[in-house]
UniProtKB/Swiss-Prot annotation:
Descriptive protein name: UPF0301 protein Msil_1255
Pfam hit, one: DUF179
PANTHER family registered for this protein in UniProt: UNCHARACTERIZED PROTEIN YQGE, UPF0301 PROTEIN YQGE
Xref: SUPFAM superfamilies: VC0467-like (SSF143456)
Record-stated family: Belongs to the UPF0301 (AlgH) family.
HAMAP family referenced in this protein's UniProt entry, alphabetically: UPF0301 (MF_00758)
Superkingdom, natural source: Bacteria
Organism of derivation: Methylocella silvestris (strain DSM 15510 / CIP 108128 / LMG 27833 / NCIMB 13906 / BL2)
Single GO cellular component term: cytosol
Length: 206
């Protein structure tokens, strides 16, 4: 998967693009990095696509530890973080730019020239300012932090979908922010009436 980010957020020709939807990996997914993955598609255009994997935890670091590593707070301030910050999950967002952080969050938070509203319930901010806001209790009501992202070059995602690598379904903020990581895959499929146990790699798109 490539590292090129679409510049326009996928807003050209709305009908052809899937930004704001979920991609669910099909059983025949040949790339183990994306097996049983659920991806929120942040941008999709003629130039390519960019998304965040929603169900892969970053096991070696917590949000509070990351704040210390980035000098947002001092180590002795971890115990005084607001409850909002303690709820932020840290995910492995994908194999591209794994040292870079991306915050998916509710639309009640916005930073000029930094926040990209994606749909009615989700925005993306990738600057340290949002981490500072969360640490102070001034951040969005709901948020997840992803390290890295999944990227596709021009036409690559479309080709993978034609090969039944992915199923696309409508996104739901409750699934993105609230659902337990271990159940997101099954929950995403159940939302469109698919029994995960009977899912075939020959199934077409939603």
């Amino acid at each position: 998967m490539g590292s090129r980010l679409p510049r326009d957020g996928g807003k050209q020709g709305h009908g052809a693009f899937l930004d704001g939807q979920l991609l669910v990996a099909m059983p025949g997914m040949s790339d183990n990095r994306f097996s049983r993955s659920v991806i929120y598609l942040c941008a999709h255009s003629e130039e390519g696509a960019m998304g965040i994997i929603l169900n892969r935890p970053a096991r070696k670091v917590t949000f509070s530890e990351l704040l210390v590593q980035l000098d947002v707070i001092k180590a002795d301030e971890m115990i005084r973080l607001p409850a909002q910050a303690e709820l932020v999950q840290v995910l492995k967002g994908g194999p591209v730019e794994t040292g870079r952080g991306f915050v998916l969050h509710s639309n009640d938070f916005f930073i000029d020239d930094s926040t990209l509203p994606i749909d009615a319930g989700v925005s993306l901010t990738a600057t340290i300012d949002i981490l500072r806001a969360i640490a102070k209790g001034d951040g969005p009501d709901r948020a997840i932090l992803a390290l890295g992202y999944a990227g596709w070059s021009a036409g690559q995602l479309e080709a993978e979908m034609q090969d039944n690598g992915w199923l696309n379904i409508p996104a739901d903020p409750s699934l993105i922010f609230d659902e337990a990581l271990g159940s997101k895959y099954e929950r995403a499929l159940q939302k469109i009436g698919i029994d995960p146990g009977r899912l075939s790699s020959d199934l077409g798109h939603a």
